[in-house]
């Protein structure tokens, strides 16, 4: 009978207990409010709508990042595909031509996050999924329809509840150091078909009598 050394058995045991590399439990579509971002970083253009910051496959207990290799990204050559991405997912610190040529922002997000769902979505499918999920909600119009408009402060609870009314899931909010609404995370189950409450939402931290600015 073949006997494995005790150390080998221990390594195999640990590997069996580890999560499958690249497996994910949910996906978070991270939308950014360009005005808030551009108050912290010099921008080349400032869209007047929410734009995609990323689509992040993740696990509740273990953060997934960089599940592939640095050279896993393929430059997107298709013109309509690039245009569609730029409208929804622009690189705010670069001119349009530079963004679409170098694709640094898209590359960075895909290498860091997209590779963590590559067993299910290839690169083309990943970016198309991000665009499709973004198009499910007109977040800016929805906020306006619920009384949240630019230039005013609102409690974190009001913004959270409004977004949940629209998406049917509790969001993950992030703010700048100046307490401006920056990111809105909308979470989906692993099939990307159903909105869920975001696990472990960080949300914005404010004093009880202060709100956050929607600039």
Curated annotation (Swiss-Prot):
The active site is at 53 (proton donor), 109, 113 (proton acceptor). Glycans are attached at residues 49, 59, 160, 172. Its EC number is 4.6.1.19. Residues 1-22 form the signal peptide. GO terms for biological process: RNA catabolic process. One of its GO terms (cellular component) is extracellular region. It is found in: Secreted, Extracellular space. The keyword Glycoprotein applies. The keyword Signal applies. Disulfide bonds join 38-43, 67-116, 175-204, 187-198. Keywords: Disulfide bond, Endonuclease, Glycoprotein, Hydrolase, Lyase, Nuclease, Secreted, Signal. RNA binds at residues 32, 53, 91-92, 94, 105, 108-109, 112-113. SUPFAM superfamilies: Ribonuclease Rh-like. InterPro entries: Ribonuclease_T2_eukaryotic (IPR033697), RNase_T2-like (IPR001568), RNase_T2-like_sf (IPR036430), RNase_T2_His_AS_1 (IPR018188). GO terms for molecular function: ribonuclease T2 activity; RNA binding. It catalyses: a ribonucleotidyl-ribonucleotide-RNA + H2O = a 3'-end 3'-phospho-ribonucleotide-RNA + a 5'-end dephospho-ribonucleoside-RNA + H(+). Belongs to the RNase T2 family. Self-incompatibility (SI) is the inherited ability of a flowering plant to prevent self-fertilization by discriminating between self and non-self pollen during pollination. In many species of the Solanaceae, self-incompatibility is controlled by the single, multiallelic locus S. This stylar glycoprotein is associated with expression of self-incompatibility in potato. This is Ribonuclease S-6.
């Amino acid at each position: 009978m073949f006997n494995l050394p005790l150390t080998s058995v221990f390594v195999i045991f640990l590997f069996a207990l580890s999560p499958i590399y690249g497996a994910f439990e949910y996906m978070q579509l991270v939308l950014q409010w360009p005005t808030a971002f551009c108050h912290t970083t010099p921008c080349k253009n400032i869209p007047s709508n929410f734009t995609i910051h990323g689509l992040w496959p993740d696990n509740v207990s273990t953060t997934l990042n960089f599940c592939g290799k640095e050279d896993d990204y393929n430059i997107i050559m298709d013109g309509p595909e690039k245009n569609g991405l730029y409208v929804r997912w622009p690189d705010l610190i670069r001119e349009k031509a530079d963004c679409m040529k170098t694709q640094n922002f898209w590359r960075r997000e895909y290498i860091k996050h997209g590779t963590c769902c590559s067993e299910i979505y290839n690169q083309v499918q990943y970016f198309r999924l991000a665009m499709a999920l973004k198009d499910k909600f007109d977040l800016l119009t929805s906020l306006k329809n619920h009384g949240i408009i630019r230039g005013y402060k609102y409690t974190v609870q009001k913004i959270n509840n409004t977004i949940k009314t629209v998406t049917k899931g509790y969001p993950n909010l992030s703010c700048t150091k100046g307490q401006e609404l920056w990111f809105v995370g909308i979470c989906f189950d692993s099939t990307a078909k159903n909105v869920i409450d975001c696990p472990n939402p960080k949300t914005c931290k404010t004093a009880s009598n202060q709100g956050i600015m929607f600039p």
